[in-house]
Amino acid sequence: MQIKTKAIVISAIKYQEKSLIVKCFTLSDGLKSYFVRDAFSSKKSNQKIAYFQPLTILEIEAVHKNKGTLERFKEVKIATPFHSIHYDVIKSTIVIFISEILHHSIHEEEKNEAFFTFLETALHWLDNHDQIANFHLILLLETTKYLGFYPDISNTEHPFFEMTEGLFSPFHAISSLTEHETNLFKKLIDLKFDNSNTNTLHSTERQILLKILINYYSYHLDGFKKPKSLEVLKEVFS
């Protein structure tokens, strides 16, 4: 089936000398993997290696056989060029980290237009703003809405957040956050991209929240792996 859709690049792995295997989250079909022959060749101008940087938003034409095999692009172009993401060291570190998180989190080949729209909007926000220290934390938490384990916030007056059940509790269990960690987590829940500058988190608080979120993903996603770029991200925001 021939399709034309938007796609967000999740990962690109070199195959042999000149080719790539590119994983994309598409608007039309969810997660798809593509084989790009001669991606490193200057002759193939419509499928340049530069198009497949982490979280680049593409317009693609492709043939989807939907047989669980690698698909093929017919045409690829940048949907909306980023102005700063791939040129700013901090922003590029963030997108590498987020792309790793998504690589280990999205597994289903099914359409999720709401999730795609959220990611696209968030990336444009990142590209157009400079006060971004809380961006990765907000995105990780908001992403859990689309992955199916957003915290139950009906009882936030309780002092402990229980990680395995994803809810606030009056009792402390083995998998609960401490009271201090829970208060920080509540603070994060109240943050949105547009109000993140008025609700300042200190660098140590960000480090605590990042650890909480990585652990939370590990509790709720089978086979979730800690991103290799995590330590670099910690250094950036230390």
Curated annotation (Swiss-Prot):
Signal sequence bounds? none
Zinc-finger found in the keyword field: no
The domain of life is: Bacteria
Q: Which InterPro entries match?
A: ARFGAP/RecO, DNA_rep/recomb_RecO_N, NA-bd_OB-fold, RecO, RecO_C
The terms describing its cellular component in GO are: bacterial nucleoid
Q: Name one Pfam family in it.
A: RecO_C
The record's keywords, sorted A to Z, are: DNA damage, DNA recombination, DNA repair
Which SUPFAM superfamilies would you find in this protein's record? ArfGap/RecO-like zinc finger, Nucleic acid-binding proteins
Family label: Belongs to the RecO family.
Tell me, in a sentence or two, what this protein's role is: Involved in DNA repair and RecF pathway recombination.
The identity of this protein, by name, is DNA repair protein RecO
